[in-house]
């Protein structure tokens, strides 16, 4: 692993995977820059932007709201609620797992 990048696992569930490019894979391994263009350490907010630009192909408004996720999407960082980790400010580390699960379902 390069010192300039971070390798993380990202998983989508509860329908969020349907927003991604076919074949709508639920699990992804991503290699992203360790710092953003301003030199700040890469955090979950950066990851959300990366997903928006590189993985989501349709209806991004169902996943993102500004620089965060929409209400109703549960975010887990290493199996813990992201609210306990500082939400979007959590600095990503090699080997982290970030899971996005929609808790909203039609019926």
From Swiss-Prot:
Keywords: Cytoplasm, Isopeptide bond, tRNA processing, Ubl conjugation pathway. There is a cross-link at residue 107 (Glycyl lysine isopeptide (Gly-Lys) (interchain with K-? in acceptor proteins)). InterPro entries: Beta-grasp_dom_sf, Mopterin_synth/thiamin_S_b, Urm1. CDD domains: Ubl_Urm1. GO terms for biological process: protein urmylation; tRNA thio-modification; tRNA wobble uridine modification. The modification 1-thioglycine is found at residue 107. GO terms for cellular component: cytosol; nucleus. It is found in: Cytoplasm. This is Ubiquitin-related modifier 1. It comes from Mycosarcoma maydis (Corn smut fungus).
